[in-house]
């Protein structure tokens, strides 16, 4: 089974670059403080790296 990463949205997506908003949505994050556990895949890492300034990553 693949490793997982916990991702938390810590800043608002309001007024951000549209592609970065889509990355946050693609990770399954909906509101500030919302945490999800996603698989550690290159696709998810790419979305995390693109919107890193709005996220907290653990694991």
Curated annotation (Swiss-Prot):
GO terms for biological process: translation. Signal peptide: none annotated. GO terms for molecular function: structural constituent of ribosome. Keywords: Ribonucleoprotein, Ribosomal protein. It comes from the Bacteria. One of its GO terms (cellular component) is cytosolic large ribosomal subunit. Coiled coil: none annotated. InterPro entries: Ribo_uL30_ferredoxin-like_sf (IPR036919), Ribosomal_uL30_bac-type (IPR005996), Ribosomal_uL30_ferredoxin-like (IPR016082). NCBIfam families: rpmD_bact (TIGR01308). Belongs to the universal ribosomal protein uL30 family. Part of the 50S ribosomal subunit. This is Large ribosomal subunit protein uL30. It comes from Stutzerimonas stutzeri (strain A1501) (Pseudomonas stutzeri).
